[in-house]
């Protein structure tokens, strides 16, 4: 039996219900789609956090934009002269990472600390879309009026 991992597809959608949980698999995308590494955390029913590992970047080299239903994080290292590395294990290549946001999910803020960019998201469901309880009226038999009489 063949198993596919579709978790990379879920990482790019925030606030959507996972309709295909039973299919917990698909292709594993490699390369650019997985750089920089990130975590998507559910903090509560309506709060999420995206954390990106951006070692070697500074806050002024990173751009975070939210436009309609897409959150885009871009980074580009500034040129600081030529350096001669014997071994280079910390990547500094430019990147662009996008996340699809569900309806009513907004970006609350972002902070950068020790090479980790954290973006806070909150889902705000409008009152008109929230479930509400409908009261049921109970009419007693004495409140019912008879409209016609039975013929004799």
Curated annotation (Swiss-Prot):
The entry's keywords: Stress response
InterPro entries for this protein: A-crystallin/Hsp20_dom, ACD_IbpA/B, HSP20-like_chaperone
Designated name of the protein: Small heat shock protein HspA
Family: Belongs to the small heat shock protein (HSP20) family.
One term under GO cellular component: cytoplasm
Pfam families on file: HSP20
Domain spans labelled sHSP: 29-139
Organism whose genome encodes this protein: Bradyrhizobium diazoefficiens (strain JCM 10833 / BCRC 13528 / IAM 13628 / NBRC 14792 / USDA 110)
């Amino acid at each position: 039996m063949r198993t596919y991992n579709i978790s990379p597809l879920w990482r790019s959608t925030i606030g959507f219900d996972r309709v295909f949980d039973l299919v917990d698999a698909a292709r594993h995308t490699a390369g650019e789609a997985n750089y920089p590494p990130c975590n998507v955390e559910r903090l509560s029913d309506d709060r999420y956090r995206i954390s990106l590992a951006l070692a070697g970047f500074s806050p002024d080299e990173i751009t975070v934009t939210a436009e309609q239903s897409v959150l885009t994080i871009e980074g580009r290292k500034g040129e600081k002269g030529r350096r001669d590395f014997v071994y280079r294990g910390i990547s500094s290549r430019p990147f662009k990472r996008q996340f699809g946001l569900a309806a009513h999910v907004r970006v609350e803020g972002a902070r950068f600390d020790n090479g980790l960019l954290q973006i806070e998201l909150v889902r705000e469901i409008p009152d008109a879309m929230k479930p509400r309880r409908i009261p049921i009226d109970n009419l007693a038999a004495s409140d019912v009026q008879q409209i016609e009489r039975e013929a004799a």
